[in-house]
Amino acid sequence: INYSNQRNFIIRKYNKLCDWQLHLDADEILTQKLIKSINIILASEEKKHVYLIKRSVIFMKKKLFFGGSSNWHLRLFPSKTTLVENTTYDQHFVSSKSKQYLSGDLNDFISSNISKWIISHNNYSSSIAKVKYKNIKKTVNANFFGNNIERLRFFKKMYLKFPSSFLKPIILFIYKYFFLLGFLDGKVGFYYCFFNSLWFRTLIEAKKYENKL
């Protein structure tokens, strides 16, 4: 049973019980501005759209603004309109309904300290290293000119196709830290880009190589 199976089980269960669904992880907190935006949508009783929410990362007790740390995710939707991609890794909520963006942030406190973050990502990297990407059926299209999620999928697809497993994490770090201005988040911005791209992605590539030995 993977993340997709669990989410879709809950979605289908509450399709019969609720008009709307808002999906959060345990380490995510809504800002007051986002709560206000959600209340306006619910009060309108209009169910024509599904809604993307801006996820902002809190890393080492600092809210990050650059380096690709913030992205949009479909989290609020009328029941019976949305499911999660049935994949092992990098799942997204998908819907045929038109999408709109909500004001306010969803703050994601990704770990209480760097040691716990490293432990969890070490375990996570082992799962990712076992995935055979060519066999994964994705529902979200990879589209540079699409919405935020489709654009992220496009860049991830390009990253996975890059031939050098040694250079991929280095290029990703350079892209996030310099081109996506991760350095503007100061010292914590460097640590985030280093651990999230260079360290984490190198660890995945090393485990992929180890699995072939």
Locate predicted features.
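Short, acidic/turn-prone active-site loops that include or flank metal/cofactor-
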Residues: 1-3
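Catalytic-site signature of metal-activated, phosphate-bearing donor transferases
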Residues: 5-11, 24, 31-211
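Short aromatic/hydrophobic "clamp" motif used to bind/position activated sugar donors
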Residues: 19-21
